[in-house]
Every structure is written in structure tokens, then in C-alpha cells.
Amino acid sequence: MPKMKNNKGAAKRFKKTAGGIKYKHATKRHILTKRTTKNKRQLRPNSLLPRCEVAAVARMLPYA
């Protein structure tokens, strides 16, 4: 049986930790002048994936 492959896009975006699956918020790369300071601050911390989406991401990352 061939090896299963990780979804490369998901592998770059998600990291499996003991507490769950961690990800970074979107819209935080460039052209941030139109965003308020409050909005940029709220996007700063990494978040844990909601429980309803964990199974889908786990299927994309079989070796994580």
C-alpha cells in the first residue's frame, strides 16, 4: 500500500499541538494601513481550531 500524503497547503497552515490544532489568523500579511490598531491586535495571537473543523484538518494531515 502506498504512503499517505499530507495536504501541503494544510501542512503549511496548521500545526498539531497537545491542546489542539493551532493556526494563524488571515489578513495579517500586507496592506495593514487600512486596518485599525484594535483589529490588528485582535488578529495577533494564534488560535486553536474549532472542534467542528478538527476532523477535516486531521484527515488532511495523516502524519501530524
From Swiss-Prot:
Keyword Ribosomal protein carried by entry: yes
InterPro entries found in the cross-reference section: Ribosomal_bL35, Ribosomal_bL35-like, Ribosomal_bL35_CS, Ribosomal_bL35_sf
Keywords associated with the record: Ribonucleoprotein, Ribosomal protein
UniProt KW Secreted keyword: no
Swiss-Prot/TrEMBL GO biological process terms: translation
One MF term in the entry's GO annotations: structural constituent of ribosome
GO cellular component: cytosolic large ribosomal subunit
Superkingdom: Bacteria
NCBIfam families associated with the record: rpmI_bact
Family: Belongs to the bacterial ribosomal protein bL35 family.
Name this polypeptide is given: Large ribosomal subunit protein bL35
Organism: Vibrio vulnificus (strain YJ016)
Encoding gene (name): rpmI
